[in-house]
Amino acid sequence: MSAKNLQEVLDQAGGTVDLLRNSQLGAYIYPVVPAEFTNFRREVIAWRESAVLFDQSHHMVNLFISGRDALKLITDNGINSTAKFAVDTAKQFVPVSPEGGVIGDGILFRLAEDQFVYVGRAPVANYLQFRATQGYDVDIKLDQRSPMRPYGKAVTRDLWRFQIQGPRAWEVIEKLHGGTVEQTRFFTLGHMKIEIGRASCRERV
């Protein structure tokens, strides 16, 4: 008999551990980026004691939303308040259907008064594109996640996203910048300059 809810799924499997350990789903493939550059142990030690660079450019979609109704589209379709959503900040965004069903979640950045970018999984981007056709004055641009298996073909993104993490991360950031960089607060954006151009700096705890 098939399970009707999560508790029945857990009961039939014998518990959470057995359910996850014996899952028939394959491993999630992060596109383009190798699983390890040296080995897992050395990379975890570096993460704990110095600094590591994560390439997070490829596994999420970017949905660019702009126009006079951009904020209205977001406000009408999400459970989050946008009353204090300032430019150069970000927030967790959770859109829901008119009936209240959760579509998914992701990170929403406010780049200008009428310019936003959603970063996350495809279902939310698909839903926002659908809702945008229902009377909103907005422009939408979708930057799909990178293919899991590019088969040697060049992979490009509209945005490249990197995470520097570890106790010496800020040293790395300031060395790249060539001077002091103002510390950012939770989900706020700052800017730094590196030789190849301009980068945004965001703190997420």
Task: For each feature predicted by the language model, list its residue ranges.
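Generic recognition of flexible, low-complexity loop/linker segments
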Residues: 48-51, 105-106, 204
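Short beta-strand-initiation
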Residues: 58-60, 90, 101-104, 113, ...
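Acidic, low-complexity central loop/insert segments
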Residues: 107-204
